[in-house]
């Protein structure tokens, strides 16, 4: 089990650093109060997660690799706590419509993307 824990640790580090890069890029590309960087990180994480879940679906002997990529990388790359904080800050600033839009787009788009990529990746 120590190999699995180490894999999660390493994957989580790479995922977190990648999320930070996406957040910085989103902020530079879009001049908006909407938290684009967090949304992009969550959407990309769902794409990666959907692909990986389908690829590893029947792979019983890939425990460390699944831990590295699914639990570690995707866990570090997705940003539910950041999403929640940004939504709360929008609400505190009185920007209720932007906060509601953030919740709606983030949840529906992530669920849709995850579904599509799980289905598409089964074909590969």
Regions found by a protein language model. Name each.
Residues 1-124:
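Membrane-interface helix-loop junctions in multi-pass transporters/channels
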């Amino acid at each position: 089990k120590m190999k699995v824990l180490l894999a999660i640790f390493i994957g989580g580090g790479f995922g977190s650093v990648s999320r930070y890069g996406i957040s910085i890029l989103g902020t530079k590309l879009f001049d908006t109060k909407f938290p684009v960087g967090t949304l992009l990180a969550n959407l990309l994480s769902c794409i990666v997660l959907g692909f990986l879940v389908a690829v590893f679906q029947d792979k019983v002997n890939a425990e460390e690799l699944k831990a590295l990529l699914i639990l570690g990388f995707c866990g570090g790359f997705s940003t539910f706590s950041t999403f929640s904080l940004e939504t709360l800050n929008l609400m505190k600033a009185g920007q209720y419509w932007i906060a509601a839009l953030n919740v709606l787009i983030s949840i529906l788009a992530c669920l849709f993307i995850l579904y599509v990529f799980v289905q598409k990746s089964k074909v590969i």
